[in-house]
Amino acid sequence: VDRSIFGWEVPASMFQSLNAFFIFTLAPIFAFMWLALAKRNIEPSTPLKFAIGIMFVGIGFLVLVFGMKSSSGIQTGVFWIMMIYLLHTIGELCLSPVGLSSVTKLSPKRIVGMMMGMWFCASAAGNFVAGLIARATASENISGAENIFSLAQKSAFMDVYTNVGLIALFVGILLALFSPLMKKGMHGIN
């Protein structure tokens, strides 16, 4: 990653705070937006919000690929890294709070706790898949020292991110298409 922006070198540790920054910044906006849409009777259903979130994750990966392709060398500009964090956080805000709320609303009262546990197990499975993607795009050697990767490796990384992005988009579109059926199964709970 080319971490320089406007002549300033962005500390690598700063990337760890981007997700939290975007969540704190955007969560109130999303909460207000969902309420405003609900007042106008145009709030997306829970399954459609999930679909939108998954599509934002896919778009995030594809935007990163675009950024990688647009950079002349092997390094990707910091702007593109910030964009993937932003887009993935938007996706997360369409999924996580909505999902937790849905679990409590849709689960029978006596097993809400167990269903919340299942929600977090699904999140753990997602983190496992994220680890597989990270392994497929790792740029460290066995000793752990950074290894400057080649253009061929960059191309392989772009292939992985393109595939993940396209799969996420496909799943999001599929979920959006089936969301009316899923909404009917929710028996009016949104």
Describe each PLM feature range:
Residues 1-2:
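Extended, regular secondary-structure scaffolds
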Residues 5, 9-104, 108-151, 155-179:
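Membrane-embedded alpha-helical bundles of multi-pass transporters/translocases
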Residues 182-190:
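Intrinsic disorder in cytosolic terminal tails and internal cytosolic loops
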